[in-house]
Amino acid sequence: MPVLVLRQFVFVLPRALFGAVLAFVLSSGVHAQQDAPAGAGTAKTEVLWLGQASFRIRSPGGKTILVDPWLTGGPKTPARFKDLAALEKVDLLLVTHGHVDHLGDAPEIAKRYGTVLYGPADMITPLVTIGAVPANLTHRFNKSGSVTPLPGIKVTAVKAEHSSLIVWPNPATGKNESHPAGEAVGYIIQLENGFRIWHMGDTGLFGDMQFISEYYKPDLVLIPIGGNFTMDPEDAAYAMRNWIRAKYVVPIHYNSNPLAKGTLAGFEAAMKGAPVRLVPMSEGQAVEF
């Protein structure tokens, strides 16, 4: 049954006072949530940036989630993770769209670890058709679709304003082929303790960012700031100031492509005084939330 969590304290109140106290707590931003697995309520979420939009997330329940794993080809991938064996285990594999700096090593990781690759339906279908990944190691879903790939973990695909294309080196011809891959998405990843991460993938500004924030209530936002292909620092700061309400924001998708000139310093300047904690990360750094 639902419980009210207020740090680690338990208060015994007369029944007559309970309603008033509950109303006060809820109005202060504390939410009722479903019972979590044992230990998940106090465990931390570890977020490791692997460069560009690539992240490894270790959930409070000990699961390893990999998002947009551009590792062997990524110019900013930490040296250790150029070897896919360094991942050790992958319980959940998510890709936001088909561009190489997001799809990256996902097919190889799926096959190496026997992990199902979750992604937009129109990206997964051509990957299977061209033989990049077996059908039994894929799961197709789409914007507004939710899945529960692991106990206590829920993933919802949400809108991203971006394109998607798979470039595949055909071994039979030795030439690259381009395959349309539908539309890009972002992900709301809800972990065992209710902590929610919005990985925005690649996106420009769009007004429904406000709706996504209001409806899904993310705690942590991973937001692209590089510009040219995505929002630049000023765009991203506008979204965070005006549309998105979260506790933390981590800038991503910069410092890897010379065409994407947005900088951390530019984002920090544009975010000055914003009501959200900016958590700048360096490639290879892990932060607990």
Question: What does each model-found stretch correspond to?
Answer:
Residues 117, 131-149, 237-289:
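Binuclear metal-ion centers of metallo-dependent hydrolases, dominated by the metallo-beta-lactamase
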Residues 59-99, 104-111, 119, 125, ...:
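Pre-active-site segment of Zn-dependent metallo-hydrolases
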Residues 173-242:
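Active-site-proximal loop/helix segments of hydrolase catalytic cores
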Residues 73-74, 100-104, 124-127, 145-148, ...:
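Active-site environment of divalent metal-dependent phosphoester hydrolases
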Residues 67-68, 90-98, 118-121, 197-203, ...:
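Active-site neighborhood of phospho(di)ester-bond hydrolases with catalytic His/Asp-centered motifs
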Residues 6, 14-17, 21-64, 71-73, ...:
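Zn-dependent metallo-beta-lactamase
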Residues 146-176, 277-289:
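Flexible, acidic/histidine-containing loops and adjacent segments that form or flank the divalent-metal
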Residues 39-45, 59-65, 146-156, 190-197, ...:
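Beta-strand-turn-beta hairpins that frame and shape the catalytic cleft
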